[in-house]
Amino acid sequence: MKPGGELRLRIAHRGTDGRSFAQSQFHRGALRVLRPHYPSDDGLVSYTLINPGGGFLGGDVYDIDVEVGDGAGLQLCTQSATKIYRTPQGPAVQQTVVKLGKRALLESVPDPVIVYRGGTYRQSTRVEMDESSVFLSAEIVTPGWSPDATHFGFDRLHMRTEVMMQGRMVLLDNLRMVPDVDISGIGVMEGFSHSGTLILIAPPLCNDVVFHAATNIVESVRWSGVGELECGLTRVHGGFVVRSLAYRSGRIQQIHEAIIELYRHETAKWRGAESASSMHYS
């Protein structure tokens, strides 16, 4: 099936000023990126992904290919939520492939995915990274409005993230929601309506100190909102995964933002040390 939208983005590191930049970019159909900007002085470049069509319909296929070269850093966000409407013609699909070079960094924090009544959505993300690179992803799934006020009026949701490091799989996260099989109760959504997943795979950053700091953040946010949020942290090779359940996106964003603040603090120290080392040996 021909993609309804395509995006190819290649990010490289410029040694003269330490900035990351788009070495090449290509888009076609219903995908675009806004003009890049630099949110801080560490050289990371930020791109905003937009879908001028406003949402996904049945049969839509979107292909995204991102490569971050050695020493480069990219922040990728979206302009608005990913909205999945009725899909009688077949599922809406988004396929993303990411390649990270040595000491490369990708931070992907899109707006929530909203799946409306009668919608089916499949999302696959494959990350190929070096053991010296960093990958962060934070996603939230929100049920769309339904005329009968049910939280799970959509037909099906499947979000799969696969992370490969040096050719070895270090993470396979598989989120499947099929409301025909009751997902609201124990062992699935536990009575909550919104779910969040934050993945950080970052061998240069994720030592015991960082892991314990992240654990403390999760517990602190969890206990500050007893009854409004459930969350847990699992350690994986080179990093960790945080899964959250809540009644609204804001509670999940709260825990994501706290973890991302920790991550950015550690990243700044790491990239600063890398830069100092590079200057020392140049």
Swiss-Prot record:
Disulfide bonds: none annotated. It comes from the Bacteria. It is found in: Cytoplasm. This is Urease accessory protein UreD. InterPro entries: UreD (IPR002669). HAMAP family: UreD. GO terms for cellular component: cytoplasm. UreD, UreF and UreG form a complex that acts as a GTP-hydrolysis-dependent molecular chaperone, activating the urease apoprotein by helping to assemble the nickel containing metallocenter of UreC. The UreE protein probably delivers the nickel. Required for maturation of urease via the functional incorporation of the urease nickel metallocenter. Keywords: Chaperone, Cytoplasm, Nickel insertion. Belongs to the UreD family. One of its GO terms (molecular function) is nickel cation binding.
